[in-house]
Amino acid sequence: YAEISRVVLPGGNRIPTLREFLEQGRKDPGTKLILELKKHKTPEIETRIVEEIVSLCKKLNMLDQMEFTSFSEHACREFRRLAPQNKTLYISNSLWTPINADVAKKEGFQLSYSMYVFMNRPELIDRMNEIGVESTLWIVDNPEVVDWAVKHNVGFISSNFPDRIKAYLDALRTVETARNGACNLIR
């Protein structure tokens, strides 16, 4: 950390510690913080890191604001073990070995797939909706993909430009409400 802490980002900022990130988030209790744990070399390392993350969140009384996400099934299981009340999202970009929605439901975590996976395997969304596993599509940065997500009943989308996507969805809702008197789009 000593080396990273000396790096100055554009705007004169530095990379915050996890504690600093959580303390900033604590200032707005209505904000959900999504913490992504990257995959590590061994499950043992992931377990230790998850334990430290959950311990710090508990110490700062932040668990109620947290959602956890990872590309590692093991890390997701550890988050569920140590913070079972928190939403845990398994992320995948594998077209050929996506985690089974039934397994995710049994494990208690939700699923997030890349646009590439969902667009090539839309039946995954159908199965997730059928058994009550939330679906998240990433990364959605253009209106055409938003339209596709709405058409295919994706539950959530993740974007590098959430303000633009929200504005687009708001415009769709306005048009749909004017047309039908109600609208039930992506939450």
Residue ranges and their predicted role:
Residues 1-87, 91, 95, 107-109, ...:
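Metal-dependent phosphodiesterase/phospholipase catalytic core, i.e.
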Residues 89-187:
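C-terminal active-site rim and adjoining tail of enzyme catalytic domains
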